[in-house]
Regions:
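Conserved glycine-rich
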Residues: 103-104
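Short helix-loop "hinge" at the ATP-lid/N-box region of the Bergerat-fold HATPase_c
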Residues: 33-34
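Conserved micro-motifs of the catalytic ATP-binding
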Residues: 10, 14-17
Length: 127
């Protein structure tokens, strides 16, 4: 059993994108956050510093610094203590490919034992 608090701040924003593919990317990112967060929180919000950026932040195990440069490579699974987790190394690769095709961006910051932040740079129109 996991004890995770999901915090979502409703966004008063319209995203100019292909909904199907953006949902796929969000599902992949949230799946990883849930997989690698034993307890704590997952927080989804628009960045106050970059209002066109959606942030998915978790308090999971984090990603080792040596793995960060390669996490978007096809088939790369990393080795930061996740041997018990099943991974094909295809999810983040697909996320980057999709985001680039949609003219969006994706980047990740992470610290071992603290958690991970995924930044999705989106074209937006404020309502």
């Amino acid at each position: 059993n996991k004890k995770i608090q999901l915090r979502y701040h409703p966004l008063n924003t319209t995203v100019l994108t292909d909904e199907k593919w953006l949902v796929f990317v969000l599902e992949q990112i949230l799946s990883n956050a849930l997989k690698y967060t034993k307890s704590g929180s997952i927080h989804i919000y628009l960045s106050p510093d970059a209002p066109k950026t959606l942030v998915i932040e978790d308090t999971g195990i984090g990603i080792a610094p040596e793995d960060l440069p390669r996490i978007f490579e096809k088939g790369y699974t990393g080795c930061n203590g996740r041997a018990d987790k099943r991974s094909t190394g295809i999810g983040l690769y697909l996320c980057r490919q999709i985001m680039e095709k949609l003219s969006h961006t994706i980047r990740i910051e992470s610290e071992m034992g603290v958690g991970t932040k995924v930044y999705l740079g989106l074209d937006t129109v404020s309502l």
